[in-house]
Amino acid sequence: MKRILLAALMLSLMSASAHAAGFDETINTMTAPIAEWFGKVVFFKIPIGDAALPLVVLWLVVGAIFFTVYMGFINIRGFKHAIELVRGDYANPKDAGEVSHFQALATAVSGTVGIGNIGGVAVAVTVGGPGATFWLIMAGFLGMSTKFVECTLGVKYRNENPDGSVSGGPMYYLRKGFSERGMEGFGKFVGAFYAIGICLGALGIGNMFQSNQAFVQFVNVTGGTQESWFADKGWLFGIVMALVVASVIIGGIKSIARVTEKIVPFMAIFYCVFALIVIFMNYDAIPQAIANIFTGAMTGEGVVGGALGALIIGFQRAVFSNEAGIGSASIAHSAVRTNEPVTEGVVSLLEPFIDTIVICTITALVIGTAAVAEPGFALVGQQGIAMTSAAFAREISWFPIPLAFAAMMFAFSTMISWSYYGLKGWTYLFGESQTMDRIYKAIFCFFVALGCMVQLGPILDISDAFVFLICVPNILGLYFLAPIVKRETESYFARIKSGEIKKYKHT
Amino acid sequence: MTTTYLVAIDGSEGSLRAANFATERAKASSAKLVLAYVIEWSPYSFNTPEENAERHQRREEEIERAQTTVLDPVSQTFRDKGVGVATEVRHGHAAETLVDLAKEHGAAQIFIGRKGESRMKTLLFGSVAGTLVQMSPIPVTVVP
């Protein structure tokens, strides 16, 4: 069965590529109008002055602010406790062998730390100016609260399957939460809506965008769009990438996944260290770069729509990167067996922090300092990851090569995580069966290949649209269920304070 | 109060020798034994989401396997010899977990077998017995 599917996948891709020359282009002309239309529908914009505020961004921002205030700034007051939990201070030794808080966090983080942290930030800075960075950080900070709410709910309302495995995530808490409140029909509808959305969204944000940007960087280091032999061979790179992904998710070759999961955290650290080195090599540009971030945020100089334009771009890219409000991490966190759903919520606070406030900001500073030191460096038509790469290359000429490797690893681990998120939506709709599993996984791999054949613009439109679409039912559900989370949170922290929940270590 | 001896056991020949040795001592001093099987596991490893979702099942299976294939038969033979035997299966860092279990059971001594690896191998992979000797707050008997 596996082989047949793999073969079918390969054949369809091969026959497509047989038309050879200009194939990438054909795909492009086919997808571009669809992407454009879809983007327009989801990002319905309210014009305010020169800027246009997409409704969905407003929806996310308002949600994040609401949860931050309603949960009593959980993003600040839960931070220390989150670190204690991850360190294992509260882990009962009798439960050793279950998924630890650290593991749940690491899995969720490797799903979110992706190309968005390298390429997405560059997009934000190109379109929204340096000021977008400020709003990116702000969005990360507020997003911590949204993440807290959705991950707590994910654990609280998960399904425990007869075989002992667990399935959780927004589709489950939406359905169960709404029917608890007497809206069974509506619960079923939004649950299914979310499941469809995550299935499709997984093909964009967690798939095509990743493989596309990995390919772009690959072409970049093998000689650039003019020189590289690979420049017009997106289909080839795509097929190889799709086959590797297929070998893991369909072929069940766990060792590849395991190696990746182990490399990614080190890659992230490696990336941050080198980014900091590059920033400090431009040390005389640092004050100006930081000043630009603040003034840009307030004045929005040179940005379409001014300060508001910068804000919109910053928030949009932040959500795209840390996934707060999308509900995907909630699927990953549901796997932890804990009696206290709040603990998972608290741990998940750290994800937007690591992803957006730390890694994205560092990337933004790499680009920012480079732009100050040499204003025109990015004006050679570089976009996305190529721009970040150029900023690195200014100081360390060989860095684009390890960056390409890191990008591929990030892309790969994000794709593995998202194939699982998408699959969970799929099985929610079609039931847990092996055949259904395989069908979705095959579709997923096909899109990996497709991602390398189209251009960045339409890809961003499609993936953004899918992902933002599922924020609508998710956040709606979060509003409805927030009182439950609040009650649990207060009770949990009261028991920590009274000493009813004790530390096992470090006492 | 009866004395308790903790015996580290993993089904290997060395660990069985340690268990036999401990049984003799336990008989002589009418102590009871706790046979401890530690499954090497770290809370700080990196997993895929799929592995996390299946983790609970795997854990149950691992415990079940340790219990039925190693602990049950071994403890039965010692019980037949008239020694009181309890068993424990736990996940964690081998030496650390043994120390924790010894504390929990108020054990007076730990018995452990050794593999007798070459110096090179010990240098590369470490040795549970060696680490345990360094960490343990109570006497450790290493049985060759």
Where in this protein do the model-derived segments appear?
Chain B
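Small/aliphatic-rich secondary-structure junction motif
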Residues: 2-53, 86
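A short acidic, glycine-rich active-site loop
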Residues: 54-69
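Short, hinge-like loop/turn segments at secondary-structure boundaries
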Residues: 50-54, 104-106, 128-129
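Structural beta-alpha unit
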Residues: 1, 75-110
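Glycine-rich, Arg-bearing micro-motifs that act as flexible, cationic patches
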Residues: 109-134
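Short, flexible loop segments at boundaries between secondary-structure elements
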Residues: 138-144
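Short secondary-structure boundary segments
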Residues: 37, 113-115, 144
